[in-house]
């Protein structure tokens, strides 16, 4: 994913920052505890497509 795009993207719910997961398959919002999928390099920023982070993922810095 293009780093310039990542700089301007925000969580669609809280408008907070997103972090690209290490495997680059998800954008993580720590504030809401959600992971938005990245499919074929395109972020899917729909709440209905996001998964809830588990406790370990929420605590991971």
UniProtKB/Swiss-Prot annotation:
Pfam families: Trm112p. It comes from the Bacteria. One of its GO terms (cellular component) is cytosol. Belongs to the UPF0434 family. This is UPF0434 protein PST_2635. It comes from Stutzerimonas stutzeri (strain A1501).
